[in-house]
A protein has these predicted regions:
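Bacterial N-terminal signal peptides
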Residues: 10-20
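Bacterial lipoprotein signal-peptidase II cleavage site
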Residues: 19-32
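Extracytoplasmic small-molecule ligand-binding "clamshell" domains
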Residues: 38-122
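Short loop->beta-strand "edge-of-pocket" segments that line small-molecule binding or catalytic clefts
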Residues: 46-49, 66-75, 158-173, 187
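Ligand-binding cleft/hinge of the Venus flytrap
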Residues: 60-72, 85-94, 172-192, 220-222
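Short helix-initiation/N-cap motifs at beta->coil->alpha
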Residues: 80-83, 97-108, 154, 188-199, ...
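Acidic, polar ligand-binding/catalytic clefts
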Residues: 90, 95-161
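A ligand-binding cleft/hinge motif common to bilobed small-molecule-binding domains
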Residues: 104-105, 121-131, 178-181, 202-223
Length: 223
């Protein structure tokens, strides 16, 4: 399926995405997951990633292009986030361990001590800052809409053109909340991950989804 990327021009100023690395807040629990031995904890830098958010992080079958083994798996993780994680681990003098984790499980994994950091497109909201600390952002991106090429909304040029469209975004992201700013649309339930949204777009279950530009370009290039 061909996909088309449409800029949400009217939202650019207020909806800039910040990608951050984050560590557990000093006020949060320091308890470690039982399976993580103390020796391993001190010698490794365990980073949580979805491994499904290209071009920032993805899953592949080999170690080409600098990919890193995924903990407990025969697969590997690659992407910009992985490269940043490698640099941080190197600076700490520790071995990098990538822990593949669903988006909704990243914060619990960090606060429980299962991982040492999250390196992902996670905005530093006030609620999140109550339990975890954020680094300075290392990337900013505009939000865009991904629609089906040749579909009903292929010629949309502004957010007003999406009246009646069935739209969604990823669960527990501010991408989903911005749909409320688009008048007259049908806000579908949020989805767990981007592969699911791409399939939903292919099948006609949705007319578009909100994402950041690099992910949208990746989706467009893959089809």
């Amino acid at each position: 399926m061909n996909k088309k990327v449409l800029s949400l021009i009217a939202m650019v100023l207020s909806l800039v995405l910040m990608l951050v690395g984050c560590g557990a807040n000093s006020n949060s629990s320091s308890a470690q997951a039982p399976e993580v031995q103390e020796t391993e904890k001190t010698e490794t830098f365990r980073v949580g990633l979805e491994c499904g958010y290209a071009p920032f992080n993805w899953t592949q079958l080999d170690d080409s292009n600098g990919a890193v083994p995924i903990d407990g798996s025969q697969e590997y993780a690659g992407g910009y986030d992985v490269e940043i994680a490698k640099r941080i681990a190197g600076g700490l003098g520790k071995k990098l361990v990538i822990v593949k984790t669903e988006w909704t499980g990243l914060l619990p994994a960090l606060t429980s001590g299962k991982i040492d950091a999250i390196i992902a497109g996670m905005s530093p909201t006030a609620e999140r800052k109550e339990t975890i600390d954020f680094s300075d952002n290392y990337y900013k991106s505009d939000l865009v809409m991904v629609v089906k090429r040749g579909g009903k909304y292929d010629n949309a040029t502004s957010i007003q053109d999406f009246k009646g469209a069935k739209l969604t975004a990823q669960l527990n992201t501010f991408h989903y909340t911005v749909i409320d700013q688009i008048e007259g649309v049908i806000k579908e339930p949020a989805m767990d991950d981007f592969p699911a949204m791409r399939v939903a777009l292919e099948s006609g279950m949705i007319d578009g989804y909100v994402t950041e530009r690099p992910e949208a370009v990746s989706a467009e290039s893959a089809n």
